[in-house]
Amino acid sequence: MPPSAQDLPLGHSTGSETPIRSSVELGAVIRDQRKRLALKQLDLAGLGNTGNRFIVDLENGKPTVQLQKVLDLMDLLGLEVVVRTKASRSASAP
C-alpha cells in the first residue's frame, strides 16, 4: 500500500543545506529525498495531488514547472526553501 502524507517526515530537519543554482540541481535534491523516503514517483504524484509527468519533469530539471506545486511537494518531502544573501566572492570585488 502506498504511503500517506502522515507517513512523511514533515518538520524533521537534519539541518543540512544544499545551495541550488539551477532547476537541474533542485530536481536532483528532490529525487534524492524521494528515494531516501522509499517513494516511487507515482507515490509522490498521488500524495502531492499531481500527475506523474510533473514529477518526472521536476526531477529532470525542467525550468518551467509551476513554483507552488514544487513548494508543496518539497513540503511533503520535508524540504524547504530558504533565501539568503550570498556571501561576497572576495573582499576586493567592486
Outline where the language-model segments fall.
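DNA major-groove recognition helix of helix-turn-helix/homeodomain DNA-binding modules
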Residues: 49, 68-84
